Structures are given as C-alpha cells and as structure tokens.
Amino acid sequence: VSGPVIRAAAKLGVPTAVHEQNAFPGVTNKMLAKKVDRVMITTPAAQDYFKAKHPTVVTGLPVRGEMLRADRDLSRAELGVDGRPLILSMGGSLGAKAINDAVKHMILSRYKDKNCYYLHATGSNGAGMIDELSKEIDLKENSHVMLREYINDMDRCMSAADLVICRAGASTISELQVMGKPSILIPYPYAAENHQYYNAKDLADNNAAVLIEEKDLDGEKLTAIVDLLISNMDKLKQFGENAKKMAVTDASERITNCICEIVK
C-alpha cells in the first residue's frame, strides 16, 4: 500500500524513508531503497540485500515499554515459580498445530520429573489441547504445567522464562533480544518470502537460538533439544547473553533521529 505513495513523494522531492523489520527485506522496500532518503533496518543481516541511494541505518525495531521494564524476579514471584527452569511456548494468537503437537509430546514426556515449569499458550485454534492434556495430567496436582489459550501478560511470562519456544516474527525476535532470552525458533513457513526463516537464522547464526524448520519439527526432536539445553544451563545462559548483544533498546529514538535528519 505504501509503495506508490513513497515513490510518488520521492519523485516530488518530499523527504522519504522506509523501515525494514525483517532480516530478509520485502520486495517493496528493496525497490524503494533506490529512491528514498533513508533506509532503516532492524538488523545488520538485512544490509547486504539493499542497493540503497544512501547508506542504510540500523535502528532496531521498537518494542513495548513494559518489555523493557519487566523484572524477572518479580515476574516469577507473580507466576508462583520457584528456582526451577520455566519453558515458555506459544504459536501466536491463533495457535500453530505443529507447535502445539510437539509441545504436547514434550510435556507428556517430561512433566512427571517435575524439574521444569511449562507455560504453554495454545492459541484460539488449539484450545482443545487444554482439555486433551487435562485428561492425561492432573493439572491441580501438577501445577508446574500451566496451560492457557492466550498470553495477555507477555512481559511477565517472557521475563520469567528461561527458554522460549515460538515463531520468528520481527516483533517477537526483538522482544527476545531486549530481554536476553534463549529460544527455540520455529518459523512460520508461509510468511511472505519466508522472512521468518531469515529472522530465526539471524539469531541462530549468532549462537542465540536453535532454529527448527516446521517441516523438521516433531515432538521427539523438540524434547531432545529442550533436554539438551536445560541440562546445560551455561549454554542456555550464553544463548541469552548473545541475544542481548543483538538488542537495540533505543530503536524509537534512532528512528526519530533518522526522520528528523531528513526533514530539516
């Protein structure tokens, strides 16, 4: 939608800028890059895909303020979580069947050990998973298994987590980075130009996440990777530290500065 407007504005000499959220740019932004005054990118990984009129500027992607302010210890206390690792998993607001199925297998395989907490959001399309698991697990007696349809306190849940299993949308990636969270990323395979794969690969290449393509995902594989990570907390900590190194915590300010520079 914005493509024709930006192109017309640039032709008229009106200051113009674009911002690319993903590690693999969309067609429109790549085309506009040759015309606009500023190309802002979320991650340096996107740099090589642009043939821009002016040098690209890494601004990061703004995240909600509550994600920046969340306190891990307070969040864990509010969730009733003790010192055991907390695994947070989700597949988006609608849910993702492949992720739900794999997480269900993982929980059923591991919950009896009671050495971890599991907080899983099924999404609206997967809400039946809660009833299915409640028939196999006494959730009152196993309070370390926490199932929800939707997470409306993401700042609290992600802050409290020791490992996050999720998709690889741009906003989610930025939140993982600013919070310094290790993750297992399962990109949505039908995203435009497969951009979630490249977002996940960016973290995996920086030793900040494990990337599993959905076509390769099953319960046994997910469980094995979780076992490997949870049994090596030093590695998990390193993943989190590497994610934090990639974070841009002043993205809004950087974007504002770029815009102000071209309208002076």
Question: Where would I find each of the regions flagged by the language model?
Answer:
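Well-ordered beta-strand positions
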Residues: 37-38, 55, 156, 163, ...
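A donor-sugar binding/catalytic signature common to diverse glycosyltransferases
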Residues: 154-195
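C-terminal alpha-helical cap of glycosyltransferases
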Residues: 248-264
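Short, hydrophobic alpha-helical segments
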Residues: 226, 230-234, 259-264
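Active-site-proximal region of nucleotide-activated glycan assembly enzymes
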Residues: 10-73
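Donor-nucleotide binding loops and adjacent catalytic segments primarily
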Residues: 72-74, 80-164, 197-201, 205, ...
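A short, well-ordered alpha-helix in the C-terminal region of glycosyltransferases
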Residues: 235-249
